[in-house]
A protein has these predicted regions:
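Face-selective signature of the C-terminal outer-membrane beta-barrel domain
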Residues: 307-331, 358-515, 540-544, 599-601, ...
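Outer-membrane beta-barrel signature, preferentially recognizing the C-terminal barrel domain
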Residues: 476-482, 555-609, 625-638, 764-767
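Transmembrane beta-barrel wall of Gram-negative outer-membrane proteins
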Residues: 243-276, 288-337, 362-367, 373, ...
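N-terminal periplasmic accessory domains that precede
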Residues: 103-106, 149-152, 186, 212-235, ...
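Short acidic/polar hinge/loop motifs at secondary-structure boundaries
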Residues: 155, 181-207
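Short, acidic, small-residue-rich periplasmic hinge/interaction motif at the N-terminus
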Residues: 46-48, 81-85, 99-142, 162-163, ...
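Outer membrane beta-barrel strand-and-loop segments of large Gram-negative receptors
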Residues: 424-426, 471-476, 583, 589, ...
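Surface-exposed extracellular loop regions of Gram-negative outer-membrane beta-barrel proteins
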Residues: 221-237, 276, 280-283, 294, ...
Length: 799
């Protein structure tokens, strides 16, 4: 890694010295395009010859910022064009400065009224940013046909979705933002895909972003620029040989009139889903030999999986508004969990069949109040937000357990009655001040309070018709109170137009109290403070060649349910329990990269302290095992990647090749040490457009074998084929998708801990066929609705 950094610095210094010999002419022009409300514009910028108006250089800008290098002209004419504003010209003459910053250019609105603008061009899927982030277009691509945001993220390059966790390759688990504000997993699941414009994958987040998580995925919704009514209705049917069939009905709409805006959405999922886990546990030592073959089959039935929301906003002016939003989701889960465990020891042959009739109901609700004010004159803005989140869950599972021990049959019945409530209050304020045309200061503060209460009662009977008796060993109560205060400062500027920098620091103070009756009465109380510095450098060598380097520090706190020792019962020898002794995971990440033409190169190193992992550990009984989260000692990770995108009139393609190397270290749980080897990641997303007929999507990715020192993860892959056609002047779209065609997506691997060899293989409902019909309706004309979600770090830990 040291050699790579030295090489990076050497190349940069060489190129800077090479460009420094040019003088006596304009070399570099930069600036930012905004309207009179200080909002960044998008369009095209051209450098023209003053003598004959011939084109010298040209490129598009999407976020208002533009820059040209290696101009070598004494005078040029700058032309700005866009459908958003009137054509604008600037005449620039060399006056002794070869690097010219035009500052902020305010453009006038385009008074030409266009009834319809039809753009017939292949939409590029990916945009690489100079700071190492990537921007993925969703609107008007076949990615917008995804049933859920979770499914959508599984199609994004370098993003891995598995077992409810969303990770960025080379970084780790990511936190999810909506329009720049952190949201919970439940709120994330309720976002209609039809409202998403694009997705940002931010691998090097600044101090403005919460310190939780190792990367940030920012979901950006469409800006509704039209008044009246506008919406979409979608019906989806999914059929899987493995998991069964399901339906998903989605409706979202918005209504705008004058200064009032109203939005709403509703989604309902019905049907079935399946997940199968096969696990073997072997103790080869003859003195305590044991082999367990366990299969757990989750056959889920969605009685009522629905999400809903509505929001109201009053706009004082284009950048000043107040908004109120209510959203929620219901998860009424039925079905059965079938567990079969065969245990062989030197003394006994044991078999247990356990069937859990699921009756779980969750109701999650969120209220969000926001106020935003911006002053275009001095370049300042202030956001104040308040959010209340409430999570309620009730479990009434009936467990039928049959045992066969040395040819002796046994049967018993268990009732698992549990309920938990979580209440979270968040307040935050963010202030941004423009210091100069090249400098910006961001400061903010946040306070949150979380209260979690769980009660679990296990009742046992030998006969389903007789009275059940309370079981102290499996039952428990859990209470957790937490307060987190945070403040941040981030300053961004540029030096001599040679490079841009952003430096920031975030401080967070945490105080919590935990009490549980599991394994006897236990109480924990602690407070701690952390400081998270970060630095980002962007170095434009030319229009086509840009370098970046970054350092960020992060933290990953345990999820609330990961701390709760509440028992999820599978059989007498297998339970899933939380660990109240889990510690936060600290992360230090370094990255260097280059953007050349359409190629994106990255090299990175991440060091983790107390990384949070999981394992099956031996329980109190000789043959019992508990699946729980644990802290390892440290982890070292290296990664390298190269990406390339291109687009023609009929073909758009994004391709990525990455390599990741990790080594996990443990000095506590007696993991067996093994080899380490890198993991290969391949990704290709291709859209083919047959004009006037249909679009075809071919997506494939491959994640190779991985050995990280304490275990091995086996390879997995997926291939997706989709076809879409539009009818009724694009108002109706039909899409057919075949997902995971070759059934390559599963999660399997092995590790050894506490003299026990463990192998696991998990299969999901990813091999399916899906038919989607989407109809767009409305009579909209012109307005602007801005919605913002309050930052809620603590909500991201509610899973």
């Amino acid at each position: 890694m040291r050699t790579l950094i030295v090489a990076f610095i050497y190349i940069y210094c060489f190129l800077i010295s090479a460009t420094g010999v040019k003088a006596q002419s304009i070399q570099h022009i930069s600036g930012k395009i905004v309207n009179h409300n200080n909002e960044p514009m998008m369009g095209n910028i051209s450098l023209l010859s003053v003598r004959d108006s011939t084109l010298i250089k040209q490129h598009d800008f999407l976020d208002g910022i533009f820059q040209f290098s290696n101009i070598n002209q004494n005078e040029v004419l700058v032309k700005l064009t866009s459908v958003e504003f009137a054509d604008t010209f600037h005449h620039i003459t060399y006056d002794g400065k070869e690097n010219i910053n035009l500052g902020t250019i305010r453009v006038n609105a385009n008074n030409n009224q266009l009834n319809e603008v039809v753009i017939k061009n292949q939409t590029s899927l990916l945009k690489y940013k100079p700071n190492g982030s990537i921007e993925v277009n969703v609107a008007n691509t076949l990615l917008s046909t995804s049933s859920s945001v979770n499914e959508l993220l599984g199609k994004v390059p370098n993003v891995i979705v598995s077992e409810g966790q969303i990770s960025v390759l080379g970084k780790g688990e990511a936190i999810i933002y909506l329009n720049g504000i952190l949201i919970s997993s439940e709120r994330f699941a309720a976002i209609p895909v039809s409202q998403i414009a694009k997705i940002e994958v931010i691998s090097n987040p600044s101090a403005k972003y919460d310190a939780e998580g190792k990367a940030v995925i920012n979901i950006i919704t469409k800006k509704n620029m039209e008044s009246g009514i506008k919406g979409t209705a979608s019906q989806q049917i999914t059929v899987s040989e493995f998991g069964g069939s399901s339906t998903n009905t989605l409706l979202d709409f918005n209504y705008n009139k004058n200064k009032w805006s109203f939005i709403g959405n509703y989604g309902l999922q019905l049907g079935k889903n399946r997940e199968l886990l096969y696990t073997t546990r072997t103790r080869p030592d003859p003195t305590e030999y044991m082999k367990s073959e366990l299969s757990t089959d989750w056959r889920r039935k969605f009685n009522n999986y629905s999400n809903f929301g509505f929001g109201l906003q009053y706009t004082f002016s284009e950048s000043n508004y107040v908004s109120l939003e209510y959203s929620g989701n219901i998860e009424d889960l039925g079905g059965v969990v079938e567990s079969r465990n065969s245990i062989f020891t030197t003394n006994n042959d044991i078999f247990y069949a356990t069937d859990v009739a699921k009756n779980d109901v969750r109701l999650n609700q969120f209220i969000n109040l926001n106020y935003n004010v911006a002053n275009s004159t001095n370049g300042s803005s202030l956001f104040i937000g308040l959010q209340y989140s409430n999570y309620n869950s009730k479990v009434k599972d009936l467990i039928n357990e049959n045992g066969l021990v040395d040819a002796l049959n046994s049967e018993r019945f268990l009732k698992n009655n549990a309920d938990y409530t979580i209440n979270i209050v968040n307040t935050q304020a963010d202030y941004t001040k423009k210091i100069s045309d090249n400098s910006k200061l961001e400061v903010g503060t946040k306070f949150s309070s979380a209260a979690i209460k769980t009660s679990s009662a296990f009742l046992i009977s030998d006969d389903n018709n007789t009275e059940f008796e309370f079981n102290d060993e499996l039952s428990s109560d859990f209470k957790y109170d937490e307060q987190i205060g945070a403040a941040y400062l981030n300053y961004g500027s540029s030096l001599m137009d040679k490079f841009n920098f952003s430096v920031g620091v975030r401080g967070e103070w945490t105080n919590y109290e935990l009490s549980t009756t599991a394994n006897g009465s236990q109480q924990f109380k602690k407070n701690y403070a952390n400081v998270f510095p970060n630095l980002l450098l962007n170095m434009p060598i030319s229009d086509a060649f840009k370098l970046h380097a970054s350092y960020v520090s992060r933290i990953t706190r345990p999820r609330y349910q990961g701390l709760n020792p509440y028992v999820i019962y599978q059989d007498p020898f297998t339970t899933i329990e939380g660990n109240p002794n889990l510690k936060p995971e600290k992360i230090h990440a370094f990255e260097v990269g280059a953007l050349y033409e359409k190629f994106d190169f990255k090299l990175g190193y991440t060091y983790k302290i107390d990384p949070i992992s999981g394992a099956a550990l031996r329980g109190n009984n000789p043959n019992s095992y508990i699946l729980r989260g644990i802290n390892m000692d440290k982890e070292y990770s290296y990664f390298a990647s190269i990406s390339r995108s291109f687009a023609t009139k009929w073909w758009s393609s994004t391709n990525t090749v990455s390599m990741n190397y990790s080594k996990l270290v443990d000095n506590t749980y007696s993991f067996a040490l093994g080899t380490t080897k890198p993991q290969i990641y391949l990704y290709s997303n291709n859209t083919f457009t047959i004009p006037k007929f249909f679009k075809i999507l071919l997506l494939a990715w491959y994640l190779g074998d991985k050995s990280y020192g304490l275990g091995d993860d086996n390879k997995r892959s997926t291939v997706l084929l989709g076809i879409e056609r539009s009818f009724l002047d694009n108002a109706l779209k039909l899409n057919f998708t075949a997902n995971d065609i070759f059934k390559g997506f599963n999660r399997s691997g092995n590790y050894e801990v506490g003299q026990t060899e463990i192998y696991y293989h998990r299969t999901y409902t990813t091999n399916y066929f899906k038919l989607i019909a989407t109809y767009s309706f409305g009579n909209s004309k012109k307005t602007d609705y801005k919605k913002k979600e309050l930052e809620q770090t603590e909500n991201s830990r509610v899973r």
